[in-house]
Amino acid sequence: MATPVRDETRNVIDDNISARIQSKVKTNDTVRQTPSSLRKVSIKDEQVKQYQRNLNRFKTILNGLKAEEEKLSETDDIQMLAEKLLKLGETIDKVENRIVDLVEKIQLLETNENNNILHEHIDATGTYYLFDTLTSTNKRFYPKDCVFDYRTNNVENIPILLNNFKKFIKKYQFDDVFENDIIEIDPRENEILCKIIKEGLGESLDIMNTNTTDIFRIIDGLKNKYRSLHGRDVRIRAWEKVLVDTTCRNSALLMNKLQKLVLMEKWIFSKCCQDCPNLKDYLQEAIMGTLHESLRNSVKQRLYNIPHNVGINHEEFLINTVIETVIDLSPIADDQIENSCMYCKSVFHCSINCKKKPNRELGLTRPISQKPIIYKVHRDNNNLSPVQNEQKSWNKTQKKSNKVYNSKKLVIIDTGSGVNITNDKTLLHNYEDSNRSTRFFGIGKNSSVSVKGYGYIKIKNGHNNTDNKCLLTYYVPEEESTIISCYDLAKKTKMVLSRKYTRLGNKIIKIKTKIVNGVIHVKMNELIERPSDDSKINAIKPTSSPGFKLNKRSITLEDAHKRMGHTGIQQIENSIKHNHYEESLDLIKEPNEFWCQTCKISKATKRNHYTGSMNNHSTDHEPGSSWCMDIFGPVSSSNADTKRYMLIMVDNNTRYCMTSTHFNKNAETILAQIRKNIQYVETQFDRKVREINSDRGTEFTNDQIEEYFISKGIHHILTSTQDHAANGRAERYIRTIVTDATTLLRQSNLRVKFWEYAVTSATNIRNCLEHKSTGKLPLKAISRQPVTVRLMSFLPFGEKGIIWNHNHKKLKPSGLPSIILCKDPNSYGYKFFIPSKNKIVTSDNYTIPNYTMDGRVRNTQNIYKSHQFSSHNDNEEDQIETVTNLCEALENYEDDNKPITRLEDLFTEEELSQIDSNAKYPSPSNNLEGDLDYVFSDVEESGDYDVESELSTTNTSISTDKNKILSNKDFNSELASTEISISEIDKKGLINTSHIDEDKYDEKVHRIPSIIQEKLVGSKNTIKINDENRISDRIRSKNIGSILNTGLSRCVDITDESITNKDESMHNAKPELIQEQFNKTNHETSFPKEGSIGTNVKFRNTDNEISLKTGDTSLPIKTLESINNHHSNDYSTNKVEKFEKENHHPPPIEDIVDMSDQTDMESNCQDGNNLKELKVTDKNVPTDNGTNVSPRLEQNIEASGSPVQTVNKSAFLNKEFSSLNMKRKRKRHDKNNSLTSYELERDKKRSKRNRVKLIPDNMETVSAQKIRAIYYNEAISKNPDLKEKHEYKQAYHKELQNLKDMKVFDVDVKYSRSEIPDNLIVPTNTIFTKKRNGIYKARIVCRGDTQSPDTYSVITTESLNHNHIKIFLMIANNRNMFMKTLDINHAFLYAKLEEEIYIPHPHDRRCVVKLNKALYGLKQSPKEWNDHLRQYLNGIGLKDNSYTPGLYQTEDKNLMIAVYVDDCVIAASNEQRLDEFINKLKSNFELKITGTLIDDVLDTDILGMDLVYNKRLGTIDLTLKSFINRMDKKYNEELKKIRKSSIPHMSTYKIDPKKDVLQMSEEEFRQGVLKLQQLLGELNYVRHKCRYDINFAVKKVARLVNYPHERVFYMIYKIIQYLVRYKDIGIHYDRDCNKDKKVIAITDASVGSEYDAQSRIGVILWYGMNIFNVYSNKSTNRCVSSTEAELHAIYEGYADSETLKVTLKELGEGDNNDIVMITDSKPAIQGLNRSYQQPKEKFTWIKTEIIKEKIKEKSIKLLKITGKGNIADLLTKPVSASDFKRFIQVLKNKITSQDILASTDY
């Protein structure tokens, strides 16, 4: 507030201003009354308005100064107040003087009767005007002598007009109205200047300034007019149109053009015509860019050698240097002018650069960085002889048409071009690809053409000197002929044209010419010498797999046919013949006519379409401009994840095709794909889409697509109603792609589910084959840029391949069998299907075999190929017989059991009728057969796959179905399809898997035909055989067929190698059968009468026995319940059956014995007291017709001496099955989501896998010590601790009552579950925890993991982070504010839900209640709470911003609050306002005060950190004492073994996990990695919070998280030991009252210091005198030098500094905080200060350019510090103890940022 003294002073100042104004007015009145005989000139009233505007502006400035003066009066510092008041008083006096002058002028204008102030005076010299300037008075202006002679009526000349007007003002000593500081001048002077500048304006420019009498407004209007028409693109094109070479001798024209461009940039870049450093550099670069390459170096050399003339500016000096260089280097002499140029008859330059050329600029249309573009110029008929005029009587607008005259055999001699071009690469010697995108304009075409490469053409001139034979020639495939420059030909070979252009030659050779349509032609074989076969031609290096070589190789027609996806033979031959592919190929044709049965069947047609219907329309459009599109589908499929529709777009000109597959064809999906396709064409091919043809389907005629086409300017052409033939090209291409895809699926025996990959493969192949209509590859024809295609880069679809398994285990195969699909559009690799993993992956590391046979036969042989015989088989004849049976079964299966794939599987009836009517597709018939399907269900497509996981143990059981019995023939086929090798059948007749490779076996399992697989595992009743050795003793047969003929369903157990060989003593036990049966109360299961062992099996519940009824005998069986009695949940058989029906591939029956506890089982099994021996006679085993089994099987069973164990599937799912999983913990599952045995076994095996979660080097892991949470059963139902149980009960009732009080739900309003959809019901759980302070807590939460998408929309929200808390504390401390901390109880429950959600009723599980509030666990609860709190705080005047969400403050900045979920910290300028705000919060929320100021000290914790705030001293300390104390207790025993140290890091880090091998078991490795993850999680939490001193040590050891070496554990415990010893270290903040706070960052880097040659960077960041952030990270890029690493560090430090600066600005902490960057790298500083630097690696160059730009803008200041003084050095490498203590002083703020700045060159 202003003091009374200041108010009295202010009144005195106001009185002085009024007195001065009155005195000035009286004086002016006296002057105006003086008589004058001068003729008066009228001035307009607008001048008065101008002065009034200026007066108002100065009054506003004066009011601002007064307000600032009042603020200064509140400052306590008297000395500072006096100094600032003195400066402010001077400023106020200046403003008051300007106000008095303006009032005087306004009164002068208003009191003048005739409003005339400009008077004419006459003296001896002539008529003149008097006016005053800002520097002098009574200046005379003579209109006749002072002439402004520049006139213009063109907007383009406005810069020249203003520049000349500026010179006029300077010459006649007017006030410089272009200066920013001058805002008003003498009215008489203003009138004079307005009249002068208006005389220079034409009619079109004077219209906008007719009524304007203010010179400033006229100048601003001209500038704005010019700027509005000269945007950045216009200016860039203006510079690109200029090319200066040595032939531009017209210095006046050249200077005028360059000066015009320079003035254009000056008036655009700056408001006045003054030079600035940025504009100076830009203009120099732009002028140098207009120079030809041959001229640029000469100009640069002159600039360095010639001293700069001080009298002229830099741009004029540069332009003069360019003109002088052009004149000196010009090759044209005065006596050399001949009749060549159509304008000046010169032979040394093209007409485009001639000074007499009308309406052309100096340069050529091309980007600055490209080579000069040479225009081909046609001669004017007036400059030719009569003979030439007769020969050139043709239409000038007609294009060249050389096709009629066989352009491949003729060469054009061009007299107006300076370059040689050819479209035939074979003519070029030493061909090289062009690395620069050079383009020529005007070479036979209206549009520009691109240059792909260059070489040399040899001319037959008869000379022996080979140098004179070679002409540099550019390879332009778009041109239609070879064009030779007449000038180049004469210069190199001295061959010239005769006078009448009838011959070309020299003294030795003469060639006859032929003139066609005014163009000179010669025969190619008479002029050009073709390269021989041994000539070296530099081919383009391929970018695909390095396994392919470019040397000439042979390829069979069959191989090419398969690689190119069974496309047409003629297309393949033409594509190879015309050299469309990059490699050199020699096609070996078949001796007989090539015949592909697959193609004939899959591509059969009814009749061909009519040809040439769209060809005329296509030729009228350029490539990529006209498209036709259509949709194909739906594709019938039983899988829901199969895409059903295909969108196709075909270019009418080039026939380039684009396809995409979709699940539906709604408007949104189709429009999104059309957008994507059009953007792809415009970006990748540089083409403009102008029209699209389609039918009238609703997917193409909706409003969304029409609006998009209108916005893009695309003409949408629709066919007539139901006229599909009008869109014939798209229809035919659909047929082509679909038949190609059908062929590929049939050839590869893949299911329809893979049709989208077949479509992609077919599309890619069709785009890379020559089209018969265009004779070009569609991909090459549509692209403006050069495209290389290699035929050998295509892989045959559906064929087998081997991809590299990058995660293979030791001593395991590194290859993974797979099936080739198609190219991956998002990578350089191919997509492969891995049957063993049931996944689709992308890889570029693959191997494919040599294809010499039909793929269908090859696949069949690979699937059913038998292995060699095992050496330990007893009877070789039996083996041979078995193999014979298997082969016969395979033959029968191939002939009789193939599933048929018909067109009905791919098309609907509507589409089939459409196909018949239009004859676009083959009619549905039985000629499209498909081979057997693989069992590829639930295919996962992923870019990353887990190929390291072990193959799970699979037990394939062959069972019978109750309603379906297999025949002997089918059974043999099924057995053959399982690929059981004879070598894998041991002498006892059972399969032995101990020597089977896992990868091979896994492949076999997945390659079983689906029809057989369903029969193998689809039955309800299964006979389970657990003891392989015992049952093999009982089953001995000569061949498998004899056993199979009995119709008996066998079960073959294939056990994992690791489990089978775990304990060999298990197989050496006595011949006693371990009989396991499970009891199910009141349940009976009847086996089928046919093909079963027993007719009735009844289970009854006894203590330790189960009675098995087979026939008339009841046998007691001892179960494993007596060994270990466990219980499990009840699983319903019906649910399991439902699960199997829903899955396409039912899970096989798993082995029910838990081998993990095999030792205990063995010991119990060998105990004769616990087990009884069972004997089964022939009466116990019924046969197919209900009688006994066959004599052969009966004999085998009797010989075994052991009974047959019978297991029913329902018994397997019995309630009492827990004894099988004695080592397994019981899992909780959802009530409605019971797991099958297959899932349980799968989860069990997955839990055994070695899964390592890596911690990245720069990962900010934030974790706290876990508090164990338990559920209701453990806390209350089964809790033996009565006291704890009582506490948990009370906590539960308290939570339930709180939910009722908060009106989260209403228990009185309940709904039946049947009334509410299942997707709206969310299950709940009750979580019980015991806090560290001993409080028991219960919380009812929702199961968000089961939440349906229908119950939530947007769930993302932004919250407060730890850096924002630190900013909050620093600002509050600097403002000397009062602080308190508090918690909001039940925070989420205050937020209302918008969605309709129901939860189970707390008292009646049959009902549900509606949820009204955001209960914990819901996905949207955090967002709803944040939105609710933000809305409330905004309503009471507290706002946050996007940079610091969760940090709110008022506009006066006197109240702040930081909220993280329910934890809050509040700061206010006074204690009263703080208490008022907390009371306001209490009225809306239930609060708990956790920390308050006591004696000006706040000692509390916030977000896990210990906070001590001393308001009186102005200090803040953040530590982690509490957390470190808990770590000390936790790891006390380990820390006793560690020697104490004063530094946390090691002296050296020499561990390399890539080289050092760990000697430990897999279990030890897994446990070690888990332990490392736990330790590093805690250390990362400590480091991230506030312990910056362990940053480097933790980040170094975090890279070894997957390497559990004892040395690594020692490093971690050493860090913990250091933390325990120095637990008081943290972050210290001091109150910083300096208003000019800087953001300071010091950086350092060490190159290649990591074990993998990566670099490490370190950054320390300050705000003012307080440290803000410290981090040590591994560089994201691999640096090759220390300078490059330092540049990365500087950029990272700048990025964080800029973020901090913007955040502070949003919080109102200074609008212009300077950024200071400190580094010890002198080369990095020098490189950043240079104007030009050699480009480095891409990302390094981008970061460097950003820093350079900021340095030029003076946004940052870069300083140099010595290496010893760089405190960030300890963040990149180990340092000594003394240097580390120096960093501790920085954390304690004993060494501040100002001390660091004092060590630099600041």
Curated annotation (Swiss-Prot):
Location of the protein in the cell: Cytoplasm; Nucleus
PTM text: Proteolytically processed into capsid protein (CA), Ty4 protease (PR), integrase (IN) and reverse transcriptase/ribonuclease H (RT) proteins. Initially, virus-like particles (VLPs) are composed of the structural unprocessed proteins Gag and Gag-Pol, and also contain the host initiator methionine tRNA (tRNA(i)-Met) which serves as a primer for minus-strand DNA synthesis, and a dimer of genomic Ty RNA. Processing of the polyproteins occurs within the particle and proceeds by an ordered pathway, called maturation.
Binding site for Mg(2+) 2: D1383, D1462, D1463
Binding annotation for Mg(2+) 1: D630, D695
Residue ranges constituting the Reverse transcriptase Ty1/copia-type domain according to the UniProt record: 1375-1510
GO MF entry, a single one: aspartic-type endopeptidase activity
Domain Integrase catalytic: 619-786
Catalytic activity: DNA(n) + a 2'-deoxyribonucleoside 5'-triphosphate = DNA(n+1) + diphosphate; Endonucleolytic cleavage to 5'-phosphomonoester
Transmembrane segments annotated in the record for this chain: none
Every RNase H Ty1/copia-type domain range: 1644-1790
Region of interest called Ty4 protease, as start-end residue ranges on this chain: 381-501
PROSITE patterns per the UniProt record, alphabetical: INTEGRASE
Protein keywords: Aspartyl protease, ATP-binding, Coiled coil, Cytoplasm, DNA integration, DNA recombination, DNA-binding, DNA-directed DNA polymerase, Endonuclease, Hydrolase, Magnesium, Metal-binding, Multifunctional enzyme, Nuclease, Nucleotide-binding, Nucleotidyltransferase, Nucleus, Protease, RNA-binding, RNA-directed DNA polymerase, Transferase, Transposable element, Transposition, Viral release from host cell, Virion maturation, Zinc, Zinc-finger
PANTHER family: TRANSPOSASE, PUTATIVE-RELATED, TRANSPOSON TY4-P GAG-POL POLYPROTEIN
Role according to the record: Capsid protein (CA) is the structural component of the virus-like particle (VLP), forming the shell that encapsulates the retrotransposons dimeric RNA genome. The aspartyl protease (PR) mediates the proteolytic cleavages of the Gag and Gag-Pol polyproteins after assembly of the VLP.
Quaternary organization: The protease is a homodimer, whose active site consists of two apposed aspartic acid residues.
Domain notes: Integrase core domain contains the D-x(n)-D-x(35)-E motif, named for the phylogenetically conserved glutamic acid and aspartic acid residues and the invariant 35 amino acid spacing between the second and third acidic residues. Each acidic residue of the D,D(35)E motif is independently essential for the 3'-processing and strand transfer activities of purified integrase protein.
Protein name per its UniProtKB record: Transposon Ty4-H Gag-Pol polyprotein
Protein's gene: TY4B-H
